[in-house]
Amino acid sequence: MVESEKIKKAYPDYKKTVCVDFDGTICKWAFPEEGALQEGVKTALQFFKAMGFKLIISSCRTNKKLNPKVYKQQVRIIRDYLDKHEILFDEIDDGEQGKVVADYYIDDRAIRFTEKKGWLGVISEFVNEIQKDE
């Protein structure tokens, strides 16, 4: 049984989900401002919706540990940005539920783990990424 089938069995109302990061993924990195829309993002998210996926937008902006006074305002800021650019989405993670349950995560800062690559492969990719940042 694949992971999404296990999730569906445990949570009957679950819909296959893509969780997409906001800063650096949907828009160019400009925090605390909102950057320009990334090229192709609108088409990509329309594609995921057409495939039947639920779209959840996630952002560290909504993490109340980073700034407890403004994290809820960030949900509104993200929603306004998405509406302004006519970006399709189902919900914005408000940071209250913990990690978003999703089948796929799209993020500009992710390093993907696979059993084939293993942890040595993750370390190698990590080292390459931090060397690019220096």
Predicted regions and their residues:
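HAD-like aspartate-dependent phosphatase fold
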Residues: 1-134
